[in-house]
Amino acid sequence: MSSQPFWDERIHRWRCLGSEGNELIYIDEEQTWKDYDPNSLKMNKAGSTGAEVSDVTAEATEGKESSNGEDRHTKRLYESTSAEGYPSGSRNKKSKSENSEASPAPVINKAVYIQGLPLDVTVDEIEEVFKKCGVIAKNIDNGTPRIKIYRTEDGTPKGDALIVFFRSESVELAEQLFDDTEFRYGSGQKMRVQKANIDYKKEKTVNKDVGGALKKKALRLRQQQMQQISSWDDVDEEVDDKRKKRFNKIVVLKHIFTLEELDKTPELLIDLKDDITEEAEKCGRVTNVVLYDKEPDGVVTVRFSNNEEAEACVRLMQGRYFDGRVVEASIYDGKVRFQKSGKHTLDDEEDEEKRLEKFADWLENSN
């Protein structure tokens, strides 16, 4: 019966006693057990140095390991040997390599492929249109945008192109904004915008083995693009602040009516407007109430003189029942354009409110 393998520090190999009483040694390079012969040239080539062979020869004359030593090595074995009887170091190395091959790092797609472009389109035109989706990546060597217009062998544009963005989020935005739209308005020719095949990464024009100067240039270019993104965020925040100040006095109420009710009773609009005005005035001065008779959600907007009154109205109306329906109340975000009969819009209401305020000021000053 074979003994448990143990680690031999002198030759830096695993050893054990075979079933026939012969000594075995584990060869990492071949991942197998072989007969141990300290004088063998083959063993010397397998990893033992001349000094190690001398030590092993001396060990052979001294006899086998003592029982205490074997117990000690056996304990070490249980901590570092796999269930199949192989040294865990060799097995782990193999497992790690297998795992790395089985689970490659996820590839991030930052490019879109566009079809249906005008044949005379230029890189500048494409950049001008698609920069609305985010920062377009730059070529490190010359700083030009990473936009490739595909051409035939004689140099004629084929009507398709590739754009590489700085951030992956721009890809989805480009699809949403421009897929099935005209590149040039009125041309009748619609684009097809979709995620690019990941093989585009093989088309990079800069060698990976770049010098230090080019690496610094790449880092500087990346910092500039990050600053550009940051400045866009600042602009977006500024626009959001202005929008909030402009529309935070308007409350949107939903589920006040149904389109079927309005069809059956057109005069219901007047009654609803009076009822809502009366209820909303509990929160402050109401300057305008508009019912959007083309909205299936039964939308009504109420404009107050300030934001505090509008917030109070939201608290009052949110979740209340109106003719058997639960009312949704919120501050208008300025993004949605509700539909109603005629051309009257929220912007028209604001202009009308300004005119009324000026007229009120004129009356006060004239007196």
UniProtKB/Swiss-Prot annotation:
PROSITE patterns: RRM
One annotated Gene Ontology cellular component of this protein: U2 snRNP
Disordered as annotated region, ranges: 36-104
Ranges of Basic and acidic residues composition bias in the record: 61-78
Keyword field: mRNA processing, mRNA splicing, Repeat, RNA-binding
GO biological process: mRNA cis splicing, via spliceosome
Gene3D superfamilies tied to this protein: 3.30.70.330
All residue ranges annotated as the RRM domain in the record: 112-193, 268-329
Any one Pfam family match given in the protein's UniProt record, by short name: RRM_1
Family membership: Belongs to the HTATSF1 family.
Assembly and oligomerization: Interacts with the U2AF large and U2AF small subunits.
PANTHER family in the cross-refs: HIV TAT-SPECIFIC FACTOR 1, SPLICING FACTOR U2AF-ASSOCIATED PROTEIN 2
Main function: Has a role in pre-mRNA splicing.
Protein name as it appears in the record: Splicing factor U2AF-associated protein 2
Organism of this sequence: Schizosaccharomyces pombe (strain 972 / ATCC 24843)
Gene field: uap2
